Every structure is written in structure tokens, then in C-alpha cells.
């Protein structure tokens, strides 16, 4: 289903539109111990992400993007520094949604069952809710199909629906469209924009694709040489046409900044 036809409001179909969270990264340093000694990935990095914003972390392969995301996800411990999350309710533990390069679906479960699985200890989460999250990503005719019956793009939509279904104030996405062909990836970018705008979440999105970062984000952080060396606000109205003069002008500015580290 084309995202251009998917303008459903989350609340109107019974999907909760919860509070977005802020991310505070303070003086973050990460080193790995190797046989050759300490390998510095990045050092003394600080940035803040406002609630409800869409921020991309852009960098070349090996720049430390996934390491940064894993620290923010609490999968890795930093060498020093800290990451904090905040919402309007200080007593609420901030849940994090995750979307990976591969959707990691269980092939023996239907789409609905794959979503229900992450709610197995929540008696209030019903099949109807699982179906509504699938509706949000254009899979209303596929509830009881199995992942192997879907295309790669459709499987990734299930991964997105599953991540949003836990109502996370913060969504972390690690190059989720990098394994897809460009036509399918573009369809999913549009779907993601619709869902993000409907559900009011903070998104931190890792990519190596400059055009993708501009199309999606409010702000672009550029990681390289162990530091954040670029921090660009994206001043373009939504929806964004990647062939517009405004987009192409800003893309050139972003390219100049991105490759300035090589000068």
C-alpha cells in the first residue's frame, strides 16, 4: 500500500499516540581493548535531541555509528560519559523501540503473532491492537500471513509496526532500509514519515546515505574521526521532493560538510 494513500491518524484507529522523549548524550567516550592496545572509537561527544524530533546520525562505514546506537540502546557500556532519557512523566521508565537492518521476524509465527510476542506479558495488548499497528504500515490484508510469504520491504514494515507497538517515547533505527532496493526503500521512508508524524515519537536514525538523511530528518549529526564534526538543521518543508531545487541545494551543502573531514 502506498504511503501516499495512508493518512490514517493513530488515535482515530485506536493506536496510542504517547509522549515523545528527549535524549541527552554527555561527554561520551568509547574505547575497545584490542591485542594492539586501546582502540578509540569516539571521544567526549555531547548532544541533545528534542522530544518529537527526527535526528539522523550520518557517517561512513567504521565511523562508530552502530557503536553509538548500541550505547544509547544500553547494549554497550561507554568508557566514560552518560546517556539520559526524559519524558514529561519523570516517574515513567523510558521504553526504547528498535528497528534493525533485518526485521528479525520469527518465520513460524504470523505477522500478528510476531507483534503479539513482544507483548506476551501485557494482558491489555490484544490482537486488535496488533492489527491496527499493521494497518498503520499498510499491511491490513496480511495479518495471518507468515514472513516468508512477504517481500523484504513488507517484512521491514512488520518490524517497524512491532517497534512502534510498544509505544516507545524514543525510536532507535539502525540503517533499516539499507538492504532494500531503492524503490522499496523510498516507499518505506514515506511510510515511516507518516507513522512518525501520526504517533509523536522521537526518532534517532543511523544511516550512511546523505539523501536519505535529508529526506527524513529535522537535523543531521555527522560522525567521523572520533567526533561529531557536522550538525546541520534541515530547513526544508515536508513532504520533501528529492528532485526539487531546494533539496538539491541543501544536499550539496550537506555533501560539502560531510566530506570536509577529508580536507
What are these regions (language model features)?
Residues 160:
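Hydrophobic anchor residue at the start of the ABC signature
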Residues 145-148, 166:
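Conserved signature/switch motifs of ABC ATPase nucleotide-binding domains
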Residues 58-60:
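The feature captures the beta-strand-to-loop junction immediately N-terminal to the Walker
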Residues 73:
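Helix-to-loop junction immediately C-terminal to a conserved catalytic motif
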Residues 81-94:
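Conserved ABC transporter NBD signature motif
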Residues 33-35, 77, 113-128, 136:
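ABC-type ATPase nucleotide-binding domains, specifically the catalytic core motifs of the NBD
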Amino acid at each position: 500500500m502506498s504511503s501516499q494513500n495512508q493518512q490514517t491518524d493513530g488515535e482515530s484507529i485506536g493506536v496510542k499516540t504517547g509522549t515523545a522523549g528527549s535524549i541527552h548524550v554527555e561527554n561520551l567516550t568509547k574505547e575497545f581493548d584490542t591485542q594492539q592496545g586501546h582502540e578509540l572509537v569516539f571521544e567526549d561527544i555531547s548532544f541533545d535531541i528534542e522530544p518529537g524530533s527526527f535526528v539522523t546520525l550520518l557517517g561512513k562505514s567504521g565511523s562508530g555509528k552502530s557503536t553509538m546506537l548500541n550505547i544509547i540502546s544500553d547494549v554497550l557500556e561507554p568508557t566514560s560519559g552518560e546517556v539520559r532519557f526524559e519524558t514529561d512523566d519523570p516517574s515513567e521508565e523510558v521504553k526504547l523501540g528498535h528497528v534493525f537492518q533485518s526485521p528479525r521476524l520469527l518465520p513460524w509465527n504470523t505477522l500478528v503473532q510476531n507483534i503479539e510476542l513482544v507483548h506476551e506479558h501485557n494482558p491489555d495488548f490484544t490482537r486488535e491492537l496488533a492489527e491496527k499497528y499493521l494497518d498503520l504500515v499498510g499491511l491490513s490484508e496480511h495479518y495471518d500471513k507468515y514472513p516468508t510469504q512477504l517481500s523484504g520491504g513488507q517484512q521491514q514494515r512488520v518490524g517497524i509496526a512491532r517497534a512502534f507497538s510498544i509505544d516507545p517515547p524514543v525510536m532507535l533505527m539502525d540503517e533499516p532500509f539499507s538492504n532494500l532496493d531503492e524503490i522499496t526503500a523510498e516507499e518505506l521512508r514515506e511510510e515511516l514519515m507518516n507513522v512518525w508524524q501520526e504517533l509523536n515519537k522521537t526518532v534517532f536514525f543511523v544511516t550512511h546515505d546523505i539523501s536519505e538523511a535529508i529526506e527524513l530528518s529535522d537535523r543531521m549529526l555527522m560522525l567521523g574521526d572520533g567526533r561529531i564534526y557536522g550538525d546541520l538543521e534541515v530547513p526544508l518543508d515536508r513532504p520533501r521532493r528529492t528532485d526539487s531545487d531546494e533539496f538539491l541545494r541543501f544536499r550539496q551543502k550537506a555533501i560539502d560538510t560531510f566530506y570536509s573531514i577529508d580536507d
